[in-house]
Amino acid sequence: MTTNHVIRLVTTPALVFILISAAFAGGWAIVTLDDFPEYAVAGKPVNLTFAVRQHGVTLLPGLHPTIRATTATGLTSKANVVPAAGRGEYTAALTLPQQGEWTITIASGFNDSNVPLPAVKVIAPGAPAPAPFSPPTRGLRLFRSKGCIGCHRHIEVNPERVTDAKLDLTGKRFPQDYLKRFLADPSIKPAEMPNLKLKNDEIEALAAFINKLASKTREEVQR
């Protein structure tokens, strides 16, 4: 065996290790919220617990996410994010001090993966709660807050995203029972989609949105 062959055999595994490490260190991440409120009460903390997954799959501990909420008039509120009980999970209590419409953005702490969440209506203390969203509208909001936007495109949520046609859900319809089973357990078919442990009502809402079983009401469009 020549010296060149020895060097090649010694260095190639090291090179492979470096390439794998570099690939793991880079890329993008998705943020998945456990629960995202339909509205909030001014001055009352909102608990936000979320997971960060590299490339939508690998849970990432040891990050330093940040949460920032803003209004169109320039008000700002921030929350202290701390690790939660589960691997790659984080939690924060965010207080929105004034009624109005607030936009919450979570910076995952992994590269530049930031997630602007759907607008939250903040009501005054003692004010009546807004009417609940219809399932399709709630599903639209979950499409973003559960991290579906990390891989998929839908013209009503993230029209700017460029992706493979198979990941573009705009205008697509699936058998309702199959779609619900897949959302509950993605392993029923070969796919890289993680199991997000969706609740039954979340599955119903996402299925309603993806299949467009109903249209938004005028009040919901205004909200």
Task: Please report, for each region that a protein language model flagged, where it lies by residue.
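Axial heme c-ligation environment in periplasmic c-type cytochrome domains
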Residues: 161-170, 184-223
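Residue-level recognition of secondary-structure-to-loop junctions
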Residues: 84, 94-98
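Beta-strand-rich structural segments
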Residues: 44-58, 92
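Electrostatic cytochrome c docking/interface patches
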Residues: 40, 124-144
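Short amphipathic beta-strand segments in non-cytosolic proteins
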Residues: 53-54, 65-80, 157
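Gly/Gly-Pro-rich "capping" loops immediately C-terminal to redox-active cysteine motifs
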Residues: 61-63, 140, 149-184
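Proline/serine/threonine-rich low-complexity linkers at boundaries of modular beta-sandwich domains
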Residues: 21-30
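Bacterial N-terminal signal peptides
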Residues: 10-22
